[in-house]
Amino acid sequence: MDLNRRSLIKGSVAAGVTALFGTAAQASTKVPAKWDESHDVVVIGSGFAGLAAAIEAKKAGADTVVLEKMPTAGGNSIINGGILTATCCPQQLKHGIKDSPELLAFDMLAAGLYMNQPEKVKLVAKSALSNYEWTVKELGVEYNLEVIGQEGGHSVPRYVFTKNGSGSGIVTKELEKLKKMGVPVRPRCYVERIFRDDSGRVVSIQIREGYRFPKAGSGKVKTIGVKKGLVLCYGGFSRDVDYRMMQDPKLVAKLDSTNQPGATAELWRETSRIGCAQVQNDWIQCTPWNSPKEKGMGLGWTFSQSGAAEFGLWVNTAGKRFVDELANRKVRADAIMVEQNKGLHAVAICTEANLKSYNVARPGMLKKLLESGVVKQYKTLADIAADYKMPADVLAKTVETFNKAVKDRKDPEFNRIMNPEQVPLVDGPWYAAEMSPKVHHCMGGLVTDMQCRVMDISTSKPIPGLFAAGEATSGVHGAVRLGSVSYTHLRAH
């Protein structure tokens, strides 16, 4: 027994030493003697954060280029739901909603279990309105001025909708701006290596130009010199099953992701190799409201969140509510997983009368979801019960109790915040859709300071010439990212 234990310890130490020296050798990869091209600022990633960073770099007079490994620009941002937090915006004022940066910061810290960095949270909250205004004045983004939405974990309704109901409403404007500024956004450029010189400064990168995702080794190898700064905006790794399971073993392959196919971990590994500090990589968010009938993000979430979570209710197939429909995403996703482990399913329910805001915010969407079968229409509540094999009497009692909470503006069962525009669920037509969690967002990542400089794991000091923003970084969200805060976060930094 003792011999086996000593052998195990000896073997573990040997493996650890090998891993240590192997890592050190990799980190000291020789800097290329010459470059094929060079730029003042090189931005990796073409989502919200990368494009905003490129705009600001060019405005500051830097020779700037954006590299994107996929065949088209936009990353997850272009398939984003087109919602962003904007405290004290015109839409809030129109609906008489009182809000403040301080309240937003409180909500972010509470949802994040106070694992967020307070200074970053305050910056994001303080910048929410100015970021919204920047997209309007600088980019020309158009928003729906009639409605305001409330995502889970927020104390009040505070998110606005792009007019086209998609993140593409922002991304396309950023791309247009960069084109006018003469900043190239180069697709199919996969970054393989980041090089630091003897002083520790990031000086160049190795890419594969003409890369064909996900074909390893495709494309022509080139080196690019970085004169002033490399900006890492490569996003999360929700599509990388091996890497995400290394961080959180329950996020198995059969669990779908909302992300685009390129949300993989190559640069998470590479930045670790060169000594970048990373924290909280195992805090990976799952959405609660996606449809199991759709692949990836889909569209069904718009009904389950902007319709049923805000103005209807969620029940399990036992006919009972099981969670505050406006709790943060982790609380709701975890609650659905608990129900699924019992052999039950989660169903979002709403009535025509309570979908007025949804239909104004996303005109034509309900029709599209009905045609696809993701959402179904029913004449009566009993019809929903029959279709989902719920006990009709239990479901009826659940809705009756919920309607009393709506009238009283107080939910004793789950303490849900009641939208002032919500009315009791009484008359049909009724609508329902099944929900199932999907892997969505990485809260952890690179450790940066308030100037977005990436920190060195060995010195806890900034790595010269290396910056980062967006989902690739940590510090803003802590344990949970509140919905609709992503662009506010990306642009603020």
Go through the PLM ranges and name each one.
Residues 35-47:
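Beta1/beta-strand and adjacent pyrophosphate-binding region of the FAD-binding site
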Residues 1-15:
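N-terminal secretory signal peptides and thylakoid transit peptides that target proteins
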